[in-house]
């Protein structure tokens, strides 16, 4: 269950150093940018960390307290909004608990197919990052010092207008991302996440994952449990009812699943398209009219959604990509039998 998306559905993310410093850099300085990104992914999933994360888009900013705990092969995290409402997400394994103090409600469910951690920082990239030099260029440079830590800055530059660019400031010792910028075609920053303070302790007590507010008297709801996803790594396992007939270069169908929506007569189909770095989720839902949920573009930070009606079905494509990408995918969706499998399955 992705609480960011589910929350929306309920009406509710020293610049240069001298040669003497360079001589003191670890051997990782010679690594390729792609290797650093792979280390970053490992750090986010396997390190203990706690800190204050600031998410900014436009003139808006949200601040949250993030705790990530690893115990053997198990991981858990707690994300608490540092505002007057104090909404909270607690993930233990695949179980996600969303606490809404303002609504006196707790929603318990499972992580959506392809979803990573609950933190907006972890959700920037797919679970299995794949690199393709046809669509991105990668570079590494000194990133200076952030929150007292020396960093490398990794630049991921898109080669066309269908995807965003990224700048990643990674801790040189651990590859932990301390700052992330998502940039548009004109290089303007559409979203930024950064730690204003962070610690990486050897251990974090289990009590740190306890809800910060009492849920006594709250209404508890258990959301629908997603079916096990089918992935396009096994073509014979993929039987989607819908497919995109036109895709931006490099995007392929990665995941397909369906789930029963509360109050709905038919299951909602969920398709995930990705180029290995950027991802677009497509939701196809029956029984919803255009008047209930307007067609067109909606935005939240770097995320762009495009909604269209298709033969009585509501189609919504959403992802941290330019609008033209979500619009292309949403508008080209067709019944699966009308679209050749080879168009969107990875070779």
What residues fall within each predicted segment?
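Short, solvent-exposed recognition patches
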Residues: 219-311, 323-328
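A short, surface-exposed interaction/processing loop segment used at functional sites
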Residues: 183-192, 196, 294-318
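Acidic/charged, solvent-exposed loop-and-adjacent secondary-structure segments enriched in E/D, K/R, S/T
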Residues: 100-123
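N-terminal mature ectodomain segment of secretory-pathway/periplasmic proteins
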Residues: 30-104, 134-172, 176-183
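N-terminal signal peptide c-region/cleavage motif recognized by signal peptidases
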Residues: 24-26
